[in-house]
Regions:
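Domain-level signature for proteins that mediate thiol-based redox and metal-cofactor handling
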Residues: 1-115
């Protein structure tokens, strides 16, 4: 009798996704995009389709495509079974330093940033 191996896909939690996104560093500010407060919303369905709403420091950020590629790369490395990764930017609430996490502000202060 032949048995087939069934691969079970475990959908990552929002926390696991955020943890993976901490590997994505902003190329200009020495912090990751999670601690910078760039991630506004994460949705994932049971089929493995992921949708992220994010922001950047400005709506004309020259590093947007680099950050998108880095996000997709980090998520595909950690969760190769994800089917679709959609990243949209929302600039309706302009980013400012208030969005930086407490941990992020501490790291920046250690590096000499006045924040």
């Amino acid at each position: 009798m032949k048995t087939s191996k069934v691969e079970v896909m475990e959908i990552p939690t929002e926390l696991e996704i955020l943890e993976a996104l901490k590997s994505v560093k902003d190329p200009e500010i020495p912090l990751d995009i999670v601690n910078l407060g760039f991630i506004r919303e994460i949705k994932i369905d049971k089929e493995g389709n992921l949708s992220i709403i994010a922001t950047l420091t400005t709506n004309d950020c020259p590093m947007e495509s680099y950050i998108v590629k880095s996000i997709v790369g980090a998520l595909k490395d950690k969760f190769p079974f994800l089917k679709e990764i959609s990243i949209k930017f929302d600039f309706s609430i302009p980013w400012n330093t208030d969005f930086i996490s407490k941990e992020g502000k501490e790291k920046l202060r250690e590096l000499g940033w006045k924040i």
